[in-house]
Amino acid sequence: MSVKIRLTRMGSKKKPFYRINVADSRAPRDGKFIETVGTYNPLVTENQVTLKEERVLEWLSNGAQPSDTVRNLLSKAGVMKKFHESKLSK
């Protein structure tokens, strides 16, 4: 089972809000997921992102692959840097 960390669209028409979910790569975008690890609101001027950093780092260390957009959000939040530092320290 290949696991991805990706966005799931929520909110109403023309007002998107996203959850950052861990899901099987074969599941549909808004379908079944394993765990919610954060949220992303692109409509706020500062692009509000909330994350459960420990859970994201755990999923990344277990081999979950982030989508391109999620990878950018994690990089801006500093999570990818922590992940690479922990990977290099082993």
Curated annotation (Swiss-Prot):
One of its GO terms (biological process) is translation. It holds the Pfam family Ribosomal_S16. InterPro entries: Ribosomal_bS16, Ribosomal_bS16_dom_sf. One of its GO terms (molecular function) is structural constituent of ribosome. It comes from the Bacteria. GO terms for cellular component: cytoplasm; small ribosomal subunit. Signal peptide: none annotated. Keywords: Ribonucleoprotein, Ribosomal protein. SUPFAM superfamilies: Ribosomal protein S16. Belongs to the bacterial ribosomal protein bS16 family. This is Small ribosomal subunit protein bS16.
